Amino acid sequence: MDKVCAVFGGSRGIGRAVAQLMARKGYRLAVIARNLEGAKAAAGDLGGDHLAFSCDVAKEHDVQNTFEELEKHLGRVNFLVNAAGINRDGLLVRTKTEDMVSQLHTNLLGSMLTCKAAMRTMIQQQGGSIVNVGSIVGLKGNSGQSVYSASKGGLVGFSRALAKEVARKKIRVNVVAPGFVHTDMTKDLKEEHLKKNIPLGRFGETIEVAHAVVFLLESPYITGHVLVVDGGLQLIL
C-alpha cells in the first residue's frame, strides 16, 4: 500500500503534530484546513512534496472536491486522519442553536463526510486506515460542554459502526480520545488548577497524541478501538 495520508485539521494543534510525525516517517501528506494560508504554512514546514488544501468539512461538495484534487496530485488516499474540530463551551440553556449546529456539523458530520469520500478509493484498493480524533469528554461528559461532548461521543459510535461495516474490505477505523492537551482550544483554561486532577500531573503535548494516532494508523490488527490519551484523567472522572 502507498503511504498517502489526508490530515483534516492539519494546520494546527494535534492535526499539525500528526502531519509532522508522519512526514518524518515517509508519508506523503495532504494538509487540509479551512484556512488555505494556514494549511500552506503547515505543509511548507514539512518540506518535501506535501500539499495543502482548503476545505470546510461541513460542506459535502467541499469534501468531495478536496478528495478529487488531492488524489489527482498525490495519488490514492489510503490513510485518513480527522482532527478538525471546534468547541464553544457554555451551559446548554445559554447555547445558541446555531452554535450547537456548527459544532455537530464540524465535529461529527464533517468526519462522516470525509470518511464517506475516502471509502470509494479504500474499497477499490481493498485497504485503508482511518483515525478520528475524539475527546475524553465524548466518553465521560463534562459540565459546560454538553454539545461538544455529544459531537465527540457521536464520533465514537460512528467510528465503531463504520469499523464493522468495512472490516471485510480490510479498512480499519479507530478513535484517539485526548484529555487536556496544549492547543489553541485549551490555551485559556486554568491549567494550574486543572492539572491537579490529572494523575500524571500535567497537560499533554500534541506530539504525544500524534504518536497514538500514528500507532493506530499503522496497527494492522486493531479496529473499532478507542485509545484514550489523557494522563490518567479518565481514572478519576
UniProtKB/Swiss-Prot annotation:
Q: Entry's Gene3D superfamilies?
A: NAD(P)-binding Rossmann-like Domain
Q: Which reaction does it catalyse?
A: a (3R)-hydroxyacyl-[ACP] + NADP(+) = a 3-oxoacyl-[ACP] + NADPH + H(+); a quinone + NADPH + H(+) = a quinol + NADP(+)
- EC number in record: 1.1.1.100, 1.6.5.10
Q: What is this protein called?
A: 3-oxoacyl-[acyl-carrier-protein] reductase
Q: What is the effect of changing residue 12 to A?
A: Strongly reduced ability to restore growth of an OAR1-deficient yeast mutant
Enumerate the residues marked as the site Important for interaction with acyl carrier protein (ACP): 169
List, in alphabetical order, the GO biological process terms annotated in this UniProt record: daunorubicin metabolic process; doxorubicin metabolic process; fatty acid biosynthetic process; fatty-acyl-CoA biosynthetic process; protein heterotetramerization; protein homotetramerization
Chain segments annotated as transmembrane: none
Tissue-level expression: Detected in liver and kidney (at protein level). Displays the highest expression in neuronal and muscle tissues.
Record-listed N6-acetyllysine modification sites:
40, 96, 195
Modified positions (N-acetylmethionine) are: 1
Q: How does activity depend on pH?
A: Optimum pH is 6-8 (with homotetramer).
Assembly information from the UniProt record: Homotetramer (in vitro). Heterotetramer with HSD17B8; contains two molecules each of HSD17B8 and CBR4. Does not form homotetramers when HSD17B8 is coexpressed, only heterotetramers (in vitro).
Q: Does the keyword Lipid biosynthesis apply?
A: yes
Q: Which residues bind NADP(+)?
A: 11-14, 34-35, 56, 83-85, 148, 152, 181-183
Q: Does Magnesium appear among the keywords?
A: no
